């Protein structure tokens, strides 16, 4: 009988989505098949420090991890490579723990943007999810839109705003119409996203958006249904779930609607779409997955206009795994249980790593 694999569940992080990450991580830890895997819980504080936690108590003791008020039994650790093998090194007692695979559940910056994926590759640790460049491109909404344009995949029109240029409300309205949205290029969970209706509102809300990124997109408002689709698999063979629909009860699907107001949105899973529209959503989700170089998992978000036209809103390379998160729910509606989903995602991580290990890293040998 094969030994159980040690899975490092990594959560928290120096991100505006830190608290959401802890909620996701608890659900993944609960769903992990303990007959196949042994979890190691690694929380990254809001300051960027790494800690190992001995049990699930971390999720009940705190909604966030901060260096000044750590949950009990937090052990400072570092991820490193020793003799070509990835290990967790204790900064407390200098012990070393072997790790077989990482499951990053880090939403937003310093986790979903390719940074930690680069660390995993440096220490030769298999990991769940997209690689460095697809994570970075998926996180940056402007780069995502450029890649989708090359692939001729429709998405909302936009303008790029920076702090160093004149950002004129009237020019934006002339180009995109009114109302329009502004959103930080590198943020998720609707952090810093605002619907703009007046010049006065634009000044205030743009200042808020620039708190989260140095690039902000002004994006046209698309009147239509908000539909999402889960995708998993290797880049050459993606598989899409049945779509689900989000019906916001706020003006749009804001951070508050997602995570604070229990009645912030209605979720219909599967979405009530015609068979033809369902297939079109699944096909475009898979095309987007491939165009963005995704591997492992991604959630693809759509707008559907009243005339049936599909537009990509964005992709999420580490989608939420909270109680209300669409990614696992859409797979459950498609016949894949939460536990089996997690197991398959881990297996995909191992397969991707094995394929990369077969590549040569020396030219003269």
UniProtKB/Swiss-Prot annotation:
GO terms for biological process: cell wall organization; peptidoglycan biosynthetic process; regulation of cell shape. It comes from the Bacteria. It holds the Pfam family Dala_Dala_lig_C. Mg(2+) 2 binds at residues 314, 316. Cell wall formation. It comes from Bdellovibrio bacteriovorus (strain ATCC 15356 / DSM 50701 / NCIMB 9529 / HD100). The gene is ddl. It is found in: Cytoplasm. Mg(2+) 1 binds at residues 301, 314. NCBIfam families: D_ala_D_alaTIGR (TIGR01205), PRK01372.1 (NF002378), PRK01966.1-4 (NF002528). Its cofactor is Mg(2+); Mn(2+). Belongs to the D-alanine--D-alanine ligase family. GO terms for cellular component: cytosol. This is D-alanine--D-alanine ligase. It catalyses: 2 D-alanine + ATP = D-alanyl-D-alanine + ADP + phosphate + H(+). ATP binds at residues 173-228. Residues 145-347 form the ATP-grasp domain.
């Amino acid at each position: 009988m094969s030994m159980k694999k040690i899975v490092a569940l990594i959560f928290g992080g120096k991100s505006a989505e830190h608290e959401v990450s802890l909620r996701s991580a608890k659900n993944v830890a609960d769903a992990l098949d303990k007959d196949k895997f042994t979890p190691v819980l690694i929380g990254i504080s809001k300051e960027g420090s790494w800690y190992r936690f001995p049990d699930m108590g971390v999720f009940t003791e705190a909604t966030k991890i901060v260096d000044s008020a750590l949950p009990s039994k937090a052990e400072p650790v570092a991820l490193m490579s020793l003799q070509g093998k990835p290990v967790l090194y204790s900064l407390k007692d200098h012990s070393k723990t072997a790790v077989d695979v990482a499951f990053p559940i880090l939403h937003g910056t310093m986790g979903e943007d390719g940074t930690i994926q680069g660390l995993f590759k440096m220490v030769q640790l298999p990991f769940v999810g997209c690689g460095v460049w697809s994570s970075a491109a998926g996180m940056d909404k402007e780069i995502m839109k450029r890649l989708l344009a090359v692939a001729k995949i429709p998405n909302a029109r936009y303008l790029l705003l920076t702090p160093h240029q004149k950002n004129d409300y009237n020019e934006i309205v002339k180009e995109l119409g009114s109302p329009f949205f502004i959103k930080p290029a590198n943020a998720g969970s609707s952090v810093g996203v605002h619907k703009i209706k007046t010049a006065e509102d634009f000044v205030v809300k743009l200042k808020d958006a620039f708190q989260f990124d140095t690039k902000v997109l002004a994006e046209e408002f698309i009147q239509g249904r908000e539909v999402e689709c889960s995708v998993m698999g290797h880049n050459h063979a993606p598989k899409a779930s049945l779509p689900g629909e989000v019906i916001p009860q706020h003006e749009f699907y804001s951070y508050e609607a997602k995570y604070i107001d229990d009645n912030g949105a209605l979720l219909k899973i599967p979405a009530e779409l015609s068979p033809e529209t369902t297939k079109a959503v699944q096909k475009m989700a898979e095309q987007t997955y491939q165009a963005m170089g995704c591997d492992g998992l991604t959630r693809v978000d759509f707008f559907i206009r009243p005339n049936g036209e599909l537009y990509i809103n964005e992709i999420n390379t580490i989608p939420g795994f909270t109680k209300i998160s669409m990614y696992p729910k859409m797979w459950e509606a498609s016949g894949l249980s939460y536990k089996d989903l997690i197991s398959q995602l881990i297996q995909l991580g191992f397969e991707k790593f094995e394929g990369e290990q077969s590549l040569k890293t020396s030219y003269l040998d």
